[in-house]
Amino acid sequence: MSDKVNHPSHYTWLKEKCGIEVIDITRHMDFDLGNAIKYILRAGHKSEEGYDAREKQIEDLRKAIWYINDEINNLLK
């Protein structure tokens, strides 16, 4: 069983494949880019009761787009 607080499975799947957790990548990035990468990497790996898996994946990708757009808007200021 995964540790839902310290090592949730929707973030640690990458460790099983590559030996690195999502946080090991995103902690070195600014907030918007780190969150965009986080949502991209967890897309398709997080399930939530009451949500269709495809709907959850789309939601995560939309969140990533939001953070990318926010980063672009900050750079344009």
Where is each model-derived feature located?
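Intrinsically disordered, low-complexity regulatory regions
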Residues: 1-77
